[in-house]
Amino acid sequence: MASSTNRRPAIAGVAQIVQRAEDPREAASPLRLMERAIQLAAEDAGAPKLVESLDAIFVPRGLWQYGDPGRLLAERLGSPNARTTVGAISGHIVQILVNRACAEITAGRADVIAIVGGESENSKRRLQREGIPLHWDDQIPGEPDHRIGDVTFMRTPDEQDAGILNATSVFSMCDVSLRRSLGLTPSAHRDRISDLAHRMSQIAAQNPYAWIQREVSAEEIRNPTPHNRMVNYPYTKLMTSNISVDQSAALILCSAEAATRFGVPEAKRVYLRASTEMSKTILLSERDVLHRHPGQDLAAERVFELSDTNVGDLDHIDLYSCFPFAVQAGAAALGLGTDPVPSLTGGMTFFGGPFGNYVLHSKATLVERLRADPGSIGAIGSVGGSFAHFSYGLYSTDPGEYEAPRIEDVSDEFAAMPRRSYAAGYAGLATVEAYSVVVMREGPYQAVFAALTEDGERVWGRSHDPDLMAALLADEEACGRTAHLREGIIELR
C-alpha cells in the first residue's frame, strides 16, 4: 500500500491563455482553448505526457453549451478513460473542485487530475453582432460522470418585486450598506471604490493575460459616460465583472508518487495547505446586516485555524472581484484592508471575468508567485452566487506539517446561526438601510430599497419616481431616512 506521503497532492502544472483574434471567424472555440490550456499546463510541469494519463477532468460550468466537456477533452488528449465532472455555476466552485481533486488523490482514487475552464465569449458576441453564424461544431450534448454543487439564487417574492433580480442588484445594495457602516457620504464612497478599481487596473496593465491591459483612472471609472454607463448605482460598467473575454486556464494536480514518476521537479510543486467552503445559503432578507455575511467570516476564520496561520502570514492574496464590494467584504473577513489592493491578476473587470473560470486564473497566477517565492504562503478567496457562497484556499511550496490538505465544509455550522426575520407584504413605516438605482440603457428604471421596521424586521420597496431616482444618482443620501411602504411601493419622508 502506498504511503500517505506518496499520496500528498500537489499542483504540478498551470497555464493561462488569452485569445485576441483579429477575425472572430478564426477564433478557437472554448473547447479548443481548454484543450490547449491542459497541454500547456503539462508542459509547465515539465511532463507533457501527463495529458495521456489523466484519471479525471473537472470543468467549472461556463457560458458554452457542452454537455460533458471533460469527455471531449479526454478523447482529444489521449486519456479516454478519464472520469468527468462539471461544477455548478458559482464563483466559489473552482476551490471546491480543487478540494475534491485533492481528496481523490489522497484517497488513492486518482493520480493525475486536470481542472480546466475557458470561454470564447468575446469572439462569439462579435460574430453575433456581425450576423455571422457560429462556426464551432464541437458543442456536443452529453452528461458528465459527476456534477458538483447545487447552487440556486433564492429570493422572496418581496425581494423579486423590489428588483433584487441578479448579482449586480445584490452587490450594489451591499456596497451602500457598507458605505453607511463606514460613515461615508455617497460621493466619498464612490471616490473610494473608483480608486480601488483604478488600482486594480494598474495591476492588470502589467499582466500579459489581462483582457484590458491599460491603467484606467479613477475619474474615468467613476463618472458615467456613453461607454461607461451607470448599471446599478453606485456601480458603473467599469466596476462590474467583464464576461466578454476569450480566456482559458488549467491546473494539473498529481500525487507525490505520480509527480516523481513523471519527472515533475520539486520546485514546480505547490500544495494546498488548507481550505474551507460554505455552500449553503440564506435569504438576503435574513442577513443581520447586508454588508457582512457570517458564513464568509466563518470560512475565513476556520481556514486560518486549519492551517495554523494568521493573516500576517499571508504573502500573496487574490480576492474575488466581480464588484468592488466583493473585494472589500473579502478583505474584511480576513482582517485586511484594501491598501495594498488584494489582487494578483487585476480583477474581474480589467483582467477579465470568464464566467465561472476566473478563480482558475487567480490560482494559476498564485502558483507562479509561490514558485518564485519559495516557502511563502498565498491565499485565494472566492465568492459565489449573490454574496451567498464562499471558499478560501491557502497554498505554499511548503506542504506544511500535515500529510494531506486540511479541508472543511462549514456549511452546516453556518446554517445553525441565527437569522434576521423579515416581514412579507409589509405596509407602514420603516427606516432605509440601503438602496440602489437600476439604470437601463434608456435611463433610470427603478430605485430599490431595503429597510428595517421598528421591530427590526427587514422589508423591501421600490420606486419609479424620476425625481427621486435623479436625486439618488446625484449622490443624495437615503440611508437613515424614514419611508412609508404600501404594496411594495416606497415613499421617502
Name each model-derived stretch.
Residues Q95-A103:
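Conserved phosphate-binding catalytic cores of ATP/NTP-utilizing and phosphoryl-transfer enzymes
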Residues M1-G87, C102-A110, A114-V245, A249-L251, ...:
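Conserved "HGTGT" condensation-loop signature of ketosynthase/thiolase-family condensing enzymes
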